[in-house]
């Protein structure tokens, strides 16, 4: 079947609506929408919930950009895209909770298609979701990964292990030699066996995020915490910033190609701190995190 970009766009807009409704229902605070247009073609809807009861900041962004030619930075590695018009669309979200016992989460699903007359379109899907705890709870990690595995199973036994490994490899801070969190799923360049199969998988990932994350939020959001836990949470959020600005391909691509800076940097935590040569107290819950985020088979 020929790729149907309009069908993908309809799903993504509905996904953004659903996610905002689900997150608002947990928090009680509304999302504020900021609709924007891109000079070169396209636009999007950025939605942000700030200073909520549960979420210090949650951003859910939809974008759909198109143009007559790919930027040079995008065709350098894919010469087959040169001279083609393109469409790129996706939903991405990052949730930074207030309570340090609730992990930060990130999800993204996207579709890309480049066309020129007389040639087959070049297209693919990408996406995934990952979890960044500040205090590790095994039952939360198991639930997160079990949900990821279960949504992958209809697409093949090998899908979850492959995309889990890709996620572990991708969300790695090379300069710190540590994982960003406990991973989840990450996939890109998905275009086989056909459009319908790939689109169905992207939908499963997009819809599966809330099933994976919201039960963890409900379980942890009322846990009492103090200044010490908040202090550690803000310190660890620094790793999130480091990853996004130094290693994340999507952030770098967006900034280098004149993307909408406010939407691209919506993933940043509202408050964060660094501390020179910080060492957690040996044997403390804070010290246990480095062991907890080591790559492992959670299931």
Swiss-Prot record:
Gene3D superfamilies: Coproporphyrinogen III oxidase, aerobic (3.40.1500.10)
A Pfam family that the UniProt record links to this protein: Coprogen_oxidas
Keyword Oxidoreductase: yes
Protein residues bound to substrate: 92, 108-110, 258-260
Active site per database record: 106
Protein name: Oxygen-dependent coproporphyrinogen-III oxidase
UniProt region (Important for dimerization), positions on chain: 240-275
Subcellular location: Cytoplasm
GO biological process: protoporphyrinogen IX biosynthetic process
Subunit note: Homodimer.
PROSITE patterns given in the database record: COPROGEN_OXIDASE
InterPro entries in UniProt: Coprogen_oxidase_aer, Coprogen_oxidase_aer_sf, Coprogen_oxidase_CS
Site residues (Important for dimerization), renumbered to this chain: 175
SUPFAM superfamilies, per the entry: Coproporphyrinogen III oxidase
Membership in a protein family: Belongs to the aerobic coproporphyrinogen-III oxidase family.
Main location, first listed in the record: cytoplasm
Record keywords, A-Z: Cytoplasm, Heme biosynthesis, Metal-binding, Oxidoreductase, Porphyrin biosynthesis
One cellular component (GO) term of this entry: cytoplasm
GO molecular function, one term: protein homodimerization activity
